[in-house]
């Protein structure tokens, strides 16, 4: 089995090729299709991670600091090589189903391709666990509001429910009609070259996931979507999700203070969508010819605008954007 540093130094195609071989060595019948690897297991839990990172430059050097942090001058890509490595360790002991997606960072492309196949209809699992969350003890459920599932995960892992933005399970849950959670995987400062990984945090998630997978549950957990209450301006959940706080936390390489936000963008999006009003996004990006270039996208929600932008510009990372504005 390759080391974590080895996984970090691979390109996405190299990760896909290696994981196909690795899962095959663990007695999986691996399905390799455009956008994903899928391997059905004996334990009714689907493990999810993505194989791409935001970094253009290949990671060639992994350093270990005195305080136990793993990093790279090229960007270590813990988002989401941590998730891949966690799954590698879990399937050595637990023969769960596995889904590894391509191009999550440019719009959950691989996950969306998977939802258009017949595999999504025949998962035969009770729930899904994704490993694509920063930090060390977060459990993010996004639009899933199945209280029984939320309580089950929190009780078995000891993690705390946290707000999240968007990831592969955000599109997998409604398509599969199954609940899912995204667990912290030990990386920090994602989407920057200052990203680092805390080894023991990643190992703690592996142990927490084992406890969750081994815990008994009563059949599949249905996906119950959060609902937006227009009368009081809130989402039907324990938290009011702020869609962009985690999804787009960087502007010109600097991180916003999360405490500065008062009005969740999610609520504004919902109100705009209800009124069927178009939102326009202007994005200023670097340009080799004219130094700067403006791009324009429109949609019913801010999320829709950003999705179109990243699908059209897969080579652009968010922290390369000079500035942007909605109107």
Feature locations, PLM:
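Acidic/histidine-rich catalytic neighborhood of metal-dependent amide-processing enzymes
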Residues: 54, 74-151, 161
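Catalytic-core environment of secreted peptidases
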Residues: 38-78
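Zn-dependent metallopeptidase/amidohydrolase metal-coordination segment
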Residues: 45, 160-205
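His/Asp/Glu-rich mid-to-C-terminal helical/loop segments that flank catalytic regions of hydrolases
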Residues: 189-254, 258-260, 265, 283, ...
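Short secondary-structure junctions
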Residues: 25-32, 64-66, 157-161
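A non-catalytic alpha/beta surface segment that caps or lines the substrate-entry region
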Residues: 2-43
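Solvent-exposed alpha-helices and their adjacent loops that cap or buttress functional pockets
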Residues: 39-40, 118-123, 173-175
């Amino acid at each position: 089995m390759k080391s974590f540093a080895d996984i970090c130094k691979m390109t996405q195609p190299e990760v896909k090729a290696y994981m196909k071989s690795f899962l095959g060595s663990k007695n999986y019948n691996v399905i390799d299709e455009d956008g994903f690897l899928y391997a059905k297991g004996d334990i009714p839990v689907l493990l999810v991670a993505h194989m791409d990172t935001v970094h253009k430059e290949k990671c060639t050097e992994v350093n270990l600091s005195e305080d136990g942090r793993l990093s790279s001058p090229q960007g270590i890509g813990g988002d989401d090589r941590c998730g891949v490595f966690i799954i590698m360790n879990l399937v050595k002991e637990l023969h769960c189903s596995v889904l590894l997606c391509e191009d999550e960072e440019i719009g959950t492309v691989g996950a969306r391709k998977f939802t258009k196949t017949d595999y999504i209809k025949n998962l035969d699992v009770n729930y899904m666990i994704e490993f694509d969350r920063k930090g060390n003890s977060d459990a993010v459920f996004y639009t899933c509001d199945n209280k029984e599932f939320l309580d089950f995960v929190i009780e078995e892992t000891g993690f705390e429910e946290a707000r999240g933005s968007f990831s592969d399970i955000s599109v997998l849950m409604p398509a599969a009609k199954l609940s899912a959670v995204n667990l912290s995987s030990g990386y920090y400062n994602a989407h920057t070259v200052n990203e680092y990984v805390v080894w023991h945090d990643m190992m703690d998630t592996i142990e927490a996931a084992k406890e969750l997978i081994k815990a008994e549950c009563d059949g599949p957990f249905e996906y119950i979507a959060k609902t937006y209450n227009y009368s009081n301006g809130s989402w039907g959940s324990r938290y009011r999700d702020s869609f962009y706080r985690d999804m787009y936390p960087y502007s010109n390489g600097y991180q916003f203070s999360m405490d500065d936000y008062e009005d969740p963008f999610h609520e504004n999006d919902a109100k705009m969508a209800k009124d069927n009003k178009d939102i326009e996004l202007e994005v200023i990006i670097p340009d080799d010819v004219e130094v700067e270039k403006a791009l324009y996208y429109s949609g019913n929600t801010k999320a829709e605008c950003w999705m179109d932008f990243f699908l059209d510009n897969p080579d652009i990372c968010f922290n390369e954007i000079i500035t942007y504005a909605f109107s």
